[in-house]
């Protein structure tokens, strides 16, 4: 993930927790101690601070030197010179605060059992809260300035670095309330997270699941964490028992979860109305200045190409020899018993070969990342077990991995390197104020690498089994990233629109909406079980206010980028990687040759999905498996 600026850090924490939700925790038993891993496979955080004392010096500098200075600017930002001084001081402070915060968190992730480092992390979080409070007056004061004044600053050469920032402020002006109104909305934020908090407490703390018999007849405890693994089991009866065990538990609390989700939707509608937006969807999209047409066209394009998903479900039915496909049949691998054991050194070579189309300069940065200890490679005792990319403006990027010799690990590494090199190029090109990469474009950089890698591996596949494995990997990736996420997006849109019309959302209503979507998306070969219509009750993303559509747009955009790169047009893409937030996300993508306001990118990706399914079917027929 990309390093975020101040106002993005909380969002980053929430989103990051969902992205790595299936693998987060402490390291498993029997893994090596950190001291047993050669230095070349460990990231070098000393590139940020060579000692805890130097980290502490910067922490104190932020707290005791920078923060007190902002009192001198409060109430004085109508003075052009004072405003410029204040913005520059904020950037100066934030560059140091970012380093302090990022270092402490990454250091803690090396060993989550180290109490001394956990203290550092806690101190950095307290510091960031104080930083946030110290600069919180800036935007409200700017928003109270006359539009004419803000526009004049945008034309002033001394504000050249802040032109984009001021333009974004100006766009928010029609949606800004009086000081009293803003104060009320700020007070409301204290309980705005309550629906999500109740959902997580209920789902992860209070909800209990039954014991079931596994595929060998042993009694096991069913948990949320183990459920995904059980759905991949070859034993259909076991999969069904796991499915029914999970969803029968959610069925007991469906009315509570319906009330919780309704509260979340009503909250979004309330804030949208308060800020004079036409809808909750419009208010959410406005945070990254995304036109409504992008969301609507995404749903339209997926609906127009839903036949390809129906074809894939039909293929599943044939391969698994079923009368009807149920939801617990959608995750068992179609390609069994094919494993690719790829050690880390091999992975590096594969990535350097697979990403060759990106050009010599990109490969040069890749080699720097591999050779200069940007990457923490292997699982160790008490190490954070997710995977991410992070860093600050004044550091090189860092990547945390738990590499395990699988194809999934290779693709994860390529993905995180995409984020890292995006960050590297942006920070080398943009001023701090424009160095944040919005999520809408950040995931394009990482997904582009994944698609390039799979294309490369498909070209060098030595057998039908290897090719089938890779095809299935890509098909499942597109299904999960596009079809499933757009199904979620369509559900979110409908439930918000119903509340905006004054309709109530009961558990029955929500299940009916979900059931109808399942019928539409999965087609005639699919059987919608009554318990499966409770799927909405488990999804944390529905408490993230129209977030999931970005997964789908990112993959569609990345597919267009890859086609251009494979034609030899890398220059536009490298410029895209340098853009940061120097322009709005839609414009940045247009400069890279991708227009996400049209349906074309999604149409192209899903047509490709259909072709991949056709090729899978052809190989399976050749092998006599269908």
Task: Set out the residue ranges of the language-model regions.
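Bacterial N-terminal signal peptides that target proteins for export
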Residues: 2-13
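Hydrophobic core
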Residues: 14, 18-22
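His/Asp/Glu-rich acidic catalytic environments and adjacent acidic regulatory segments
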Residues: 28-75, 99, 105-293, 301, ...
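C-terminal, non-catalytic "cap/extension" segments appended to globular domains
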Residues: 35-37, 45-46, 50-52, 142, ...
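Active-site-proximal, well-structured secondary-structure segments within enzyme catalytic domains
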Residues: 157-163, 211-226, 255, 259-402, ...
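Active-site recognition of the HExxH zinc-binding catalytic motif
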Residues: 276, 404-424, 446, 451, ...
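Conserved helix-loop functional segments at active or binding sites
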Residues: 353-364, 390, 419, 423-431, ...
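Post-HExxH zinc-binding segment in Zn-dependent metallohydrolases
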Residues: 437-466, 474-480, 554
């Amino acid at each position: 993930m990309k390093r975020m600026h101040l106002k993005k850090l909380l969002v980053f924490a929430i989103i990051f927790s969902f992205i790595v939700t299936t693998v987060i925790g402490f390291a498993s038993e029997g893994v090596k101690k950190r001291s047993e891993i050669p230095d070349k496979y460990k990231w070098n955080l000393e590139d940020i601070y060579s000692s805890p004392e130097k980290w502490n010096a910067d922490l104190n500098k932020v707290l005791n030197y920078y923060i007190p200075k902002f009192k001198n600017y409060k109430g004085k930002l109508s003075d052009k010179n004072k405003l410029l001084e204040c913005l520059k001081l904020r950037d100066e402070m934030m560059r140091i605060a970012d380093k302090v915060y990022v270092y402490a968190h990454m250091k803690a992730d090396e060993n989550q059992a180290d109490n001394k480092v956990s203290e550092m992390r806690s101190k950095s979080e307290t510091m960031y809260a104080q930083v946030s409070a110290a600069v919180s007056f800036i935007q409200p004061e700017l928003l109270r300035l006359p539009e004419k004044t803000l526009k004049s600053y945008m034309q002033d050469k001394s504000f050249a670095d802040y032109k984009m920032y001021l333009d974004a402020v100006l766009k928010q002006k029609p949606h800004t309330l009086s000081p009293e109104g803003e104060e009320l909305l700020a007070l409301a934020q204290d309980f705005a997270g309550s629906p999500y908090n109740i959902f997580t407490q209920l789902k992860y703390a209070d909800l209990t699941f039954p014991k079931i018999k596994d595929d060998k007849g042993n009694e096991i405890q069913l948990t949320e964490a183990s459920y995904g693994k059980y759905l991949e089991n070859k034993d259909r009866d076991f999969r069904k028992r796991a499915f029914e065990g999970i969803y029968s538990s959610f069925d007991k609390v469906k009315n509570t979860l319906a009330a919780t989700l309704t509260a979340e939707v009503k909250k979004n509608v309330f804030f949208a109305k308060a800020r004079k937006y036409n809808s909750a969807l419009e208010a959410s999209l406005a945070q990254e200045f995304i036109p409504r047409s992008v969301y609507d066209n995404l749903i339209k394009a997926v609906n127009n190409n839903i036949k390809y998903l129906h074809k894939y479900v039909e293929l599943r039915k044939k391969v698994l020899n079923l009368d009807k496909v149920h939801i617990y049949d959608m995750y068992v691998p179609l390609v069994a018993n094919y494993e690719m054991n790829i050690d880390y050194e091999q992975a590096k070579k594969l990535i350097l070969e697979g990403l060759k189309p990106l050009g010599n300069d990109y490969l040069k940065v890749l080699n720097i990342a591999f050779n200069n200890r940007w990457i923490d490679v292997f699982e160790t005792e008490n190490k954070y077990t997710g995977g991410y990319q992070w860093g600050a403006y004044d550091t090189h990027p860092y990547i945390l991995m738990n590499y395990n010799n699988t194809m999934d690990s290779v693709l994860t590494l390529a993905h995180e390197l995409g984020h890292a090199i995006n960050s590297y190029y942006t920070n080398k090109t943009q001023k701090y104020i424009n160095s944040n990469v919005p999520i809408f474009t950040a995931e394009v950089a990482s997904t582009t690498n994944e698609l390039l890698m799979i294309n490369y591996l498909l070209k060098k596949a030595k057998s039908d089994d290897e090719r089938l494995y890779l095809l299935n990997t890509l098909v499942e990736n597109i299904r999960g990233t596009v079809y499933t996420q757009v199904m979620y997006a369509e559900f979110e849109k409908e439930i918000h629109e119903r509340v905006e019309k004054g309709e109530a959302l009961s558990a029955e209503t929500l299940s009916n909406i979900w059931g109808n979507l399942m019928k539409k998306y999965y087609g005639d070969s699919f059987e919608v079980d009554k318990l499966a219509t409770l799927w909405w009750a488990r999804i944390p993303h529905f408490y993230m206010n129209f977030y999931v559509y970005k997964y789908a747009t990112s993959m569609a955009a990345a597919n267009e980028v890859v086609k251009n790169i494979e034609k030899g047009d890398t220059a536009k893409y490298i410029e895209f990687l340098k853009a940061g937030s120097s322009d709005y996300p839609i414009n940045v993508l247009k400069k890279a040759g991708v227009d996400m306001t049209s349906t074309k990118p999604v149409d192209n990706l899903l047509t490709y999905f259909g072709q991949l399914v056709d090729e899978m079917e052809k190989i399976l027929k050749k092998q006599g498996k269908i």
